[in-house]
Amino acid sequence: MTREQKPTFCRICEPLCGMIATVDDGRLVSLRPDKDHPLSAGFACQKGIAFTEVVNDPDRVTTALRRTAQGGFEPVSWDDAMADIADRLADIHRRHGSGAIGWYYGNPGAFSYSHTLSLSMFMAGFGPRLHVFTAGSQDVNNRFVASQLLYGSPLAIPVPDVLRTDFLVVIGANPVVSHGSVLTVPRIKDRMHDIVKRGGRVLVIDPRRTETAAQFEWLGIVPDGDAYLLLSLLHVLFGEDLVDRARLARQATGAVWLEQLARPFSPETTEARTGIDPDTVRSLARDLAGTPRAAVYGRVGTSTGENGTLTTYLLDAVNLAAGNLDAPGGSMFGRFGFPGERWAMKGLGALLRSVYTRRRSRIGGFPSVLMSEPAGVMAKEITTPGRGQVRVLLVSAGNPVLSVPNGDELEEALGGLELMVGIDLYVNETLAHCDYVLPAATMYERDDFPLPFQTLQPTPFRQATEAVIEPVGHAREEWEVIDDIARRLWRRTPGLAALALTRKTLALFGIRLSPRLLVDAVIRLGDGGDRFGLRRGGLTFSRLTADHPHGTVLAPNLRDGVLADTVVYRGRRMRLQHDEIAEEIDAVRRRRAPEGYPMRLIGMREARSENSWMHNAPLLMRGERVQHVCMHVDDATAANIVDGDMVRISSPHGAIVLPVMVTKDIVAGVVAVPHGWGHKGTGGWRIANGAGGANVNQLMSSAPEDLERLAGMARLTGVPVRVEPVAS
């Protein structure tokens, strides 16, 4: 037996913790934390360690599957599957154009550079009418839109300088469980405790006393009250002259406009909307301005409310007004460091702003965010007749039946497709409706470089990995599947023909066009890179894996003073004044709740769940795990509900039934339900099917008028609900 210990890194979530894979005769047998990793330093969570069970899961799809006439699946060869998929796709494309084709791309896809880049090339080949839906419209798309408004580029994203701050305010995030989101900080819990150890503070503002709040200071807030709080903080910062107006004028335009908009939102005025005492708000504003190194950070809770783009915009505005943007210990910007980066970002920003302004979804007229449409309207794009009706859907690394609002609507719509193809590890609740399910390689069966997360690291860091093992069974990397489809269609699609010509031209010089070729160029041109031989000993993909298998730190901290290079607008200053923001603030003033739904629903993360896709790992499901709804003890008492009772949670859009967990660690009038559950036996994962649970997104609306206008985001927090005991 040949046993090998291979350094690599985890790609389940954003800290990208270093791992050591134990491989026996080509089979992954265990994973453990990498003690020699410069940043994670021997830490990994339960999910990372349990991933061996995913790789070797007997329920995993390891051969291509084709739907039978009886409704089940049968094995099929790759060539037969791809030939039929390409023929049917080409026929539908010929009859209806690229507007008949849709692609849903799930969250794990962002953790594979090759998946991301190959899909981008596929999208370019089919042109702008191709429908692309992503998990981003349930997660992060309004971060991109807020950045586009403020900095001119959706990719200019500030991150809190956790390693140097003395006051970290966390709103709507739970990093002790999530390990950080749109923020790459290994061992983030330890780094937050370091803040306190050096005499600083960590304040968590959340409707629930989360696992993070339990370890630091907690300030409860009414769900989806964050925009009111942030506006009142701006009111105090400007009103008490806590703003360095000269610095603000150097960094941004539109400050006077913003000050006027915030003027009506005094802490006394917003108290009814936030539940926070006015003196507490004033004290917080003074502390943010008076602490030399302070940062406000928000994530899913601030993104998935009724006005998430506004809230995200206001997070940056508060950091700016308090003097904490682009400052050590504040909120800072990462950069790749390649020559001409600002001009490249300037061109890309102009392109994406133009697409955002000009391209609209067929259903609802939503703008295009990073070339994508809201997943919330995917069902209606399938069922609504007319030019551009989706007739083919490809799904990779996703389970939208469980992750988009009103999954039942989507599940019913899938039956009307002419062709549906899934690329994934399991037959999940969505892929159960496919004509073909194609087996994908896991993260340990492919090379990788965490491309999307390079600018989200307070400690600039590079790590790449080769595949630890060969793909199990007949699994293939997603990019190879996408490339195969493109190769088979190039004669019938002009855009793909141009891609084929580029591929053939490079082949004449012995160069294979692949995602690795592109990402290697990014590494070589960026900070620490070899600049294609101009910098002796610099980094390349191969040199990273061979000489730095545990990764390498490029610098201890991010550089400050880069805002002018990050902003791609002419004049190099942020733009605060936007009609869209004024309209959103007006909408906030006019918020009304439906009668008969007195409580507010929020989401919550679980340490042993990763969205909808890791409920089949025995290690994570041990102890007969059950999904619960968390409810305040006073609310339970008033409704004659006791711990463990079954309750019905109803919204204007649906209802689910769950056992209740009574607690004091939540604001009264609020209930919390973890997402990702609702496995109802239609998928091919037996442990997940046995776990069951309820799909909380059945309580959410997919109606276009209920999606956030600027980013097409689903409203997943602050949802009005009613909770009633279920008669035994």
Positions of the model-derived regions?
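Flexible, glycine/charged-enriched surface loops at secondary-structure junctions
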Residues: 96-100, 243-248, 295, 326-333, ...
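Short glycine-rich or small-residue beta-strand-to-loop segments that form or flank ligand, phosphate
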Residues: 101-107, 170-172, 295-305, 394-396
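C-terminal, active-site-flanking charged/polar segments
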Residues: 416-419, 423-448, 453-461, 486, ...
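Short beta-alpha connecting loops at secondary-structure transitions
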Residues: 214-221, 448-451, 460-471
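Long, contiguous, secondary-structure-rich segments that constitute the structural scaffold
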Residues: 467-468, 472-532, 536, 612-630, ...
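N-terminal export/assembly segments and adjacent metallocofactor-ligating motifs
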Residues: 1-240, 254, 277, 368, ...
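Extended redox/cofactor-interaction regions of prokaryotic respiratory oxidoreductases
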Residues: 116-193, 198-205, 212, 227-231, ...
